[in-house]
Amino acid sequence: MKIPNICSLKNRILLKELVKTDFKLRYQGSVLGYMWAVLRPMMLFAILYVVFAKILKMGSDIPHYPVYLLAGTVLWSFFSECTSQGIQAIVARGDLLRKISFPKWIIVVSATTTALINFLINLGVVIIFAIINGVTPSFSWLIVPFIVLELYLLSLGISFFLGAINVKYRDISSIWEVFMQALFYAVPVIYPITMVADASPLAAKIFLLNPIAQVIQDVRYFLITNQTITTWNYLPEQLLHFVPILIVIVIITLGGLYFRKRSKYFAEEA
C-alpha cells in the first residue's frame, strides 16, 4: 500500500483547513458551541455513574471507580465519534470531491482528527478529575498517548473500510450505529472486567483480545490503578498479548487498501 504523503505542505494545509471547517460546522448554531465536545461524554458519564455506581453499587471494590468509569466513557466516546464521523466523511464532502481534485484520504483523516482533538480535551478533564480524586500523578501517564494512538489507528482503519462502502451503500452508517450500541455492552466501559473473569475466565480472555477493551484497560492501568486487569497481566500465553495490536495492524492495512481501490469512484458516487 502506498503510504499517504501527510508531510506534503499542500496536504498539511488542506488537512488543517478541513479540520477547522469540521469544528465550525459541527457546533454551528448551538448555544454552547465547542463546550459540547466536553459535555457529551460528561453527561453520559453522569448518567452511568448514577445508575451503576450509586443505584446498582457497581465498582465499589475498584480504587477511584469514578475516574475509572470516566476514563472508559471518554475512550468509548472517542471511538464512537471517530468511527461514525469517519464513515460518513466522504459522503458529507461529496460536493467538495466533485469540484476539486485532491487525495481522498484527507477527508477521512480530517474527520477522525477532529474527534481526536475532542478526545484530547476530554483527556485533560479526566486527568484533572483523577488528581482531584486522589490519583497520584506518575511518569506512567506518559505511556497513555501511545495507547490512544492504537485506538485512533483502529478507528481510522474502520473509517477507511466502512467509509468506502458507505459511499455506495448509505445504510452502512446506520448499521454501524446499531452495532455500536450492542458493542458498548461487550466492552468493559461500565462494568469491571473482573466481573466477567469471576463468571467465566475464558470469556474474560476473549474480551481482552478486543483492541477496544485492551486499550481501555491499559489506559486505566497506567493512568489510575495498577490493580486493573490487562491483556498482558491476565493472559498467560505471551503470544496472545500481541493479538489486539495485530488486529489493529490488519484493519488499518486492509482498510487503507480498500479505500485506495474505491477512491477513484467517490466523486461520481458521493
Feature-to-residue mapping (PLM):
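Hydrophobic transmembrane alpha-helices and immediately adjacent juxtamembrane helices
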Residues: 1-270
